[in-house]
């Protein structure tokens, strides 16, 4: 059984998630909302993908900071890809890349986790 679970975390996979930032930043000070949101996204990706090395895309960072430090979006749709580290002397074998996913016109309601087939 331990071999199965270990193999699961070793796969290269891409998934789409909706992260509710509102509940994660509820008790946060105004002037710390955007930096804390980035930290919470990193924490979410670590837990979801099982990797310690999480890289946040520049576009996602811009989207979080687009309305300023204190008016963070309530929810954000992200695409998290677990990838192999090509660098030989890297500490971790895998890393997670978090990017912005396109939001449908009808909104974020009812969207669950979606596994994306590799386009490569």
Swiss-Prot record:
Entry GO CC: cytosolic large ribosomal subunit
Signal peptide location: none
A Pfam match: Ribosomal_L31e
The species this protein was found in: Nicotiana glutinosa (Tobacco)
Any one biological process term the GO annotation gives: cytoplasmic translation
Family in the record: Belongs to the eukaryotic ribosomal protein eL31 family.
NCBIfam families associated with the record: PRK01192.1-1
Highest taxon of the lineage: Eukaryota
Name of protein: Large ribosomal subunit protein eL31
InterPro entries per UniProt: Ribosomal_eL31, Ribosomal_eL31_CS, Ribosomal_eL31_dom_sf
Gene: RPL31
MF-aspect GO terms: structural constituent of ribosome
Gene3D superfamilies listed in its UniProt record: 3.10.440.10
Record keywords: Ribonucleoprotein, Ribosomal protein
